C-alpha cells in the first residue's frame, strides 16, 4: 500500500449535504482496498484565479493509504461530480 494525498475544491455555493456526500463517496472508494488516515476540512478559501467563474472554493484534504488502482477510481468519481471544480491526487 502507498500513501496518497487528495485535495479537492467544491463549489462555494454547495450545501453541507453535498459536501458530505462527496467525502462519503471518497471514503467508500478508499475502503474497498485501503484506509483513510486523516481528513482535514480547510473551509472556504479564495482561489488564486477564477475556476469555472468561481473566485472561492471549499477545500478538503484527505490523506489515505491504498492500492495503486484506488486513486484512479477516486479520480474518475471526482471528474464526474459537477460540484467538484478542481482536484489533485499525489503520492505522499
From Swiss-Prot:
GO terms for molecular function: small ribosomal subunit rRNA binding; structural constituent of ribosome. One of its GO terms (cellular component) is ribosome. Disulfide bonds: none annotated. Gene3D superfamilies: 3.30.70.60. Keywords: Ribonucleoprotein, Ribosomal protein, RNA-binding, rRNA-binding. GO terms for biological process: translation. Belongs to the bacterial ribosomal protein bS6 family. Binds together with bS18 to 16S ribosomal RNA. PANTHER family: MITOCHONDRIAL 28S RIBOSOMAL PROTEIN S6, SMALL RIBOSOMAL SUBUNIT PROTEIN BS6M. This is Small ribosomal subunit protein bS6. The gene is rpsF.
Amino acid at each position: 500500500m502507498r500513501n496518497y494525498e487528495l485535495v479537492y475544491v467544491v463549489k462555494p455555493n454547495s450545501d453541507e449535504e453535498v459536501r458530505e456526500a462527496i467525502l462519503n463517496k471518497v471514503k467508500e472508494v478508499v475502503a474497498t482496498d485501503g484506509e483513510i488516515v486523516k481528513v482535514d476540512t480547510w473551509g472556504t478559501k479564495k482561489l488564486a484565479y477564477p475556476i469555472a467563474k468561481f473566485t472561492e472554493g471549499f477545500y478538503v484534504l484527505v490523506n489515505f493509504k491504498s492500492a495503486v488502482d484506488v486513486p484512479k477510481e477516486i479520480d474518475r468519481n471526482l471528474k464526474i461530480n459537477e460540484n467538484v471544480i478542481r482536484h489533485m491526487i499525489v503520492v505522499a
